[in-house]
Amino acid sequence: MPKQDSLWLKSLRWIQKHLVHTIVVPQDPFADLNLDTSRPLAYVMKTESLSDIAALSEVTEKLGLPSPYEPLVVNGVVAPRVVCLQGRKPLFGERAGNEPFLECFMRLLAVHKERPELDIQLVPVSLYWGRTPGKEDDTMKAAVLERENPTWLRKCFMILFLGRHNFVQFSNAVSLRYMADEHGTDMGIAHKLARVARVHFRRQRKVMTGPLLPNRQALFDSLLKSESLRKAIQEEAVSKKISETQSRETAIEYLDEIAANYSDSLVRIAERFLTWLWNKLYSGINIKGAEHIRQLHHDGHEIVYVPCHRSHMDYLLLSYILYYQGMVPPHIAAGINLNFWPAGPLFRRGGAFFIRRSFNGNKLYTAVFREYLDQLFAKGYSVEYFSEGGRSRTGRLLAPKTGMIAMTMNSVLRGIERPVTLVPVYLGYDHVMEVATYHKELSGKKKQKESVWQVFGAIRKLGNFGQGYVNFGEPITLQTFLNEMAPNWRAELADDPEQKPTWLTPAVNVLANRVMTRINDAAAASSVTLTSLALLASEQNALERCLLERQLDLYLTLLKRVPYTSFTSVAEGDGKHLVQQGIDLNKFSVSSDPLGEIVSIDANQAISMTYYRNNIIHLFIIPSLIASCLTHNEQSQRQQIVAIVNDFYPLLKAELFMGIKDIPSYVNQVLDLFIEQGLITESDNLSVVTEHSSQLVLLSGSVSETLQRYAIIFNLLAHRPKMERSELESESHLLAQRLGALHGITAPEFYDKKLYGTLSVKLKELGYLSDKDDKSDVKRIRDQANSLLRASVRQTIVASVTAEHIS
């Protein structure tokens, strides 16, 4: 390798500095890969290349890592800092067959034998000039821009045309101390290291570029030849009394309507546009958990991303983040309503495939769509779909639509060998541009059809949107899930492949709810969501600034000391910092008087801010319920509070997709924190500390509307034990409207008919809606809910229920 200060290398680095833009994956190798700067470090690369090492040098200089040009000197032994598994490829002929890397490995291992305290980190580094996966029928382009083993001439073309899309990827370090201690230091171990490294680089390339792209027409021809689709075409011809040719043409039309037409060129252009867009819109995008998903890709999993759906931005944000995290953007299931010009063709070339809102018993369309989805899985493309079916208008997760999850499950049952893993993804924003539109729709305005004019209108309103949040939740591998739900599923399918298992539909429902729960498990508590939570719990949506900051400090402490899950992310900084962030985003107003500053939510913004509160209300609903128990009862005991939480938790779990596994432990941890923070004391009973009672009262406000809903339901059930489910839903909704009108409740979800439907289903499942004469459980929960309400609200509910007619 030429010396770092040689004229040749200086010239090469000067050229690359002007032609090359390098993206590092992961963005923070120290944090994501746990690199230890106190230990010696060497790099392993697949191929020796001056341009690759020059690009690596630029990156290591910025990151504070050792330069690849500096030799590694340990215990008097000098070794190259970079070990390359194969030499440079000449312009003509084959590269030399010698293996100098084995000598390097042997020298490094031998030093570990001499010095037991030594532990060199061997860090694999992959470089990619562009990320085109190539096509199954590539010819000339592949020859000119061959990426796997380019000659120096081809590498020049790659730098010239693809230099702005250079990726340098660091992988987890290998401990040479571990290798020496566990496997020895002979030549056999050096060979093993080389084999493992080659496999790693091969897998890493597939993760970064994805599988080869098919010719679209060839894909259609392949799908139409499949046995299941041929059968569906024949059945369509018989049922519609048309020829098989006409039926086949219909199937082709469906395929053309559905199928993506992925274009790497468009993705590269979109990357530049989206980089500009995110920099204009957001001050930062916070990501948590990407490294684990990258490892799943590396291990050969078929990945299906299942994000929550807040905004049309979701389609762009997740794909962009995955691209920058060294993974291939997924094929996205998009609603057919988005297939309008010019967005539809662009989305399609970006990987979107389109799905109708309803299949309406169309067996041919169903067969075509299922076969296309199976093909995506079979070829190794990652897939993304929104299990909610549409964007949430309230900020809460919607009840899942199970169609896509069922089709994914069926693909596994039909024989996919690789593990298929669902990855729940929480997407959050400090500002959702559609929020105002959502509330118009909730108030009765008809939803506008998507069009190019809406796109222009949205672009015109672009501004400072704060930060975005992408948190990857705990993955669910479907084969493992099936083993849990039906241990003998493989044998059952082998006996009768055509018979739909009786356990399949219940299993799909369990899976859908588990996905939603794990999305909420990965929630992001941000400045906007936390401040909205606190202000909306106050009487006038306003608090003294110092009190608000103190309340947010309590919330931050609660989330950090009693974490909801390990996948949840919490905003950095203290309460003072969070309040200022929200003010800077124009989400909250500040007024002053001689006694100090007051932070408030404008009256015309209060409904909109419930959207952001609802994103994280599940994180605080149990602590809020505990606070309500403490503030409404002068003397409380732990067992009483645990019992109350246990009674309400099944309903909270159903409507908020919560996944707390050990309620008594969680409740006791929260109570212990309250004691530590000086909010309560404990002797024989739990007592609120008077001077800090305002913090608990404010915290309890977050559960008040939920308790009011439960009080409505259980007062109705206790008063009319034989009430039918449909009757309970309609009368609960009617009484909620009355309560809202009398007591100024404006949160949209309070009047959501679907929410009362969800609760009634859960009530029936729990046995509260039954013909049993014993209604003691219903009356107990009614009394508990009533005891935690303000007297005026309780009086309204009881009086309305006991009246002859609700009006």
Swiss-Prot record:
Pfam families recorded for this chain?
Answer: Acyltransferase, GPAT_C
> Which protein family is named in the record?
Belongs to the GPAT/DAPAT family.
Q: Which SUPFAM superfamilies match?
A: Glycerol-3-phosphate (1)-acyltransferase (SSF69593)
Copy the domain comment.
The HXXXXD motif is essential for acyltransferase activity and may constitute the binding site for the phosphate moiety of the glycerol-3-phosphate.
Alphabetically ordered keywords of this record: Acyltransferase, Cell inner membrane, Cell membrane, Lipid biosynthesis, Lipid metabolism, Membrane, Phospholipid biosynthesis, Phospholipid metabolism, Transferase
Pathway field of the UniProt record reads: Phospholipid metabolism; CDP-diacylglycerol biosynthesis; CDP-diacylglycerol from sn-glycerol 3-phosphate: step 1/3
Query: Which InterPro entries does the entry link to?
Result: GPAT/DHAPAT, GPAT/DHAPAT_C, GPAT/DHAPAT_LPLAT, GPAT_PlsB, Plipid/glycerol_acylTrfase
What topology does the record note for this protein and the membrane?
Answer: Peripheral membrane protein
Subcellular location field? Cell inner membrane
The GO molecular function terms of this record are: glycerol-3-phosphate O-acyltransferase activity
GO CC entries: plasma membrane
What is the designated name of this protein? Glycerol-3-phosphate acyltransferase
Q: Which biological process annotations from GO are given for this protein?
A: CDP-diacylglycerol biosynthetic process; fatty acid metabolic process
Lineage of producing organism:
Bacteria, Pseudomonadati, Pseudomonadota, Gammaproteobacteria, Alteromonadales
Q: What is its EC number?
A: 2.3.1.15
Decide whether keyword Lipid metabolism is in the record: yes
